[in-house]
């Protein structure tokens, strides 16, 4: 049964199909989500440039469809031009809709801070250029990237085909390269990470913040109503 106290949560998603990311039904099966798709062509700066100017229009569309809060559910889309751009984009969405708005980059920052992670090992789906922009963004936000291991993927649909074993191995390699890290950021909203997160946390004993789960966590908190995720998906949901 839908929880009446929680308003509809609007999500701007990279794929053109405009579907609510699969994590939503697993984490918050009773909450109302709607989505609008940007049609991102590639997970590269050139791909982001082609769609970033339409984000505010998608936010307006979601507001007209009944959203009470809006999140841009793309991590690299919101960090690739830096911290000031992420903040300005959030303001532009809010001013255009009159709604509380957020981004996935803001979500991962909030998640890392909620878990006390300052020194962060990066495990990403990205190519090197995007990894460098992520590290610079985190540094602007007073976090310390300790190293990075990545998959080098540029295809939007390819992200969802990365299996759990590959994600666990990626996180383990990222942490083993920087074992003094406080935790791990598993970055890219297209990765399906819910099964990997608890396994990595069990193996390594450090928290994992992952883009899509953090995006849902952040948007639900912004919406209010006190909804809790189903248990078993990691420290971000269990401890914050």
Swiss-Prot record:
Coiled coil start-end: none
Catalysed reaction, written as an equation: 2-aryl-2-methylmalonate + H(+) = 2-arylpropionate + CO2
Key words of the record: Decarboxylase, Lyase
Keyword presence, Lyase: yes
Species annotation: Bordetella bronchiseptica (Alcaligenes bronchisepticus)
EC number from the UniProt entry: 4.1.1.76
Protein name, per record: Arylmalonate decarboxylase
Source organism, top-level taxon: Bacteria
Enzyme class: lyase
Molecular-function GO term, any one: arylmalonate decarboxylase activity
